[in-house]
């Protein structure tokens, strides 16, 4: 049980509640609870590719990776267990779609850490779900309610749009830099001498903004965009299409599904796992980069200045350089 997150631990206090239910798990699930959960039937939808990879050997066809679950996946379930994410817009997006697939009186359970903002769930869903707090423990809350009426879900209305010079950007809720180009990415883009050439990997690409802008400036590059999140990948595909750019989009847990080498790997890596600071992704990105770079290839990363990139880069490459910086961010580069 120690490997389970606090929201999953609070759910386990109510296992009898689910024994005869057909359950679909969705939302910000961050552990393997569905593999050991006691219910009549268990299905899982996840936007996270690494969760799909871990759970699919056990759940087979009863787990689905994608932006949203299919009607077929939810068709034989009668109960929703939704893990509240830290992004309210993402929660609303996913729950609105989920609720649109179920008949009225469907049972909805919502669980999450208090600091994630789960307290807003009751008001956010008031029109469609009558929620009440069922339990509170481990700084988490569990809400329960029944679907009162199905919402009307419109996928097209979920997209957010902005422009970076002549590049059009589209993003789905929950994807990094949803409303504007973030400061770190701006600094990273400013560090490049255009035009670029060769094979380029935009790793943990988010909406693919970095790769899309660089490909627009240097159309001769052979671009690959990768991310672990389905909404990020869908946003990347949309941005490539709207800007008429050809590139490959790959679901991958860092390098898990990327066997080849590149002339340049670039990234603005996240350093949070859910609500907690976690640099394991950063460590893995740097440690495994040499296996994915040609000789003379470069790893270029932007990061908050306080993160331990110098130590990590020195440990793997034996050297690094700071190409540019401001008060908050630094752009690092290491060459194989």
UniProtKB/Swiss-Prot annotation:
Alphabetical list of SUPFAM superfamilies matching this protein: S-adenosyl-L-methionine-dependent methyltransferases (SSF53335)
Enzyme class: transferase
Subcellular location, record wording: Cytoplasm
InterPro entries listed in its UniProt record: Mtase_sm_N, rRNA_ssu_MeTfrase_C, RsmC/RlmG, SAM-dependent_MTases_sf, Small_mtfrase_dom
EC number per UniProt: 2.1.1.172
Gene Ontology CC entries for this record: cytoplasm
Catalysed transformations (reactions): guanosine(1207) in 16S rRNA + S-adenosyl-L-methionine = N(2)-methylguanosine(1207) in 16S rRNA + S-adenosyl-L-homocysteine + H(+)
A Pfam entry, by short name: MTS
UniProt entry keywords in alphabetical sequence: Cytoplasm, Methyltransferase, rRNA processing, S-adenosyl-L-methionine, Transferase
Molecular function in Gene Ontology: 16S rRNA (guanine(1207)-N(2))-methyltransferase activity
Lineage top rank: taxon: Bacteria
Record-stated family: Belongs to the methyltransferase superfamily. RsmC family.
Function as written in the Swiss-Prot or TrEMBL entry: Specifically methylates the guanine in position 1207 of 16S rRNA in the 30S particle.
NCBIfam families with a match to the protein in the record: PRK09489.1
Subunit structure: Monomer.
Protein name: Ribosomal RNA small subunit methyltransferase C
Organism: Hamiltonella defensa subsp. Acyrthosiphon pisum (strain 5AT)
Taxonomy of the source species: Bacteria, Pseudomonadati, Pseudomonadota, Gammaproteobacteria, Enterobacterales
Gene responsible for this protein: rsmC
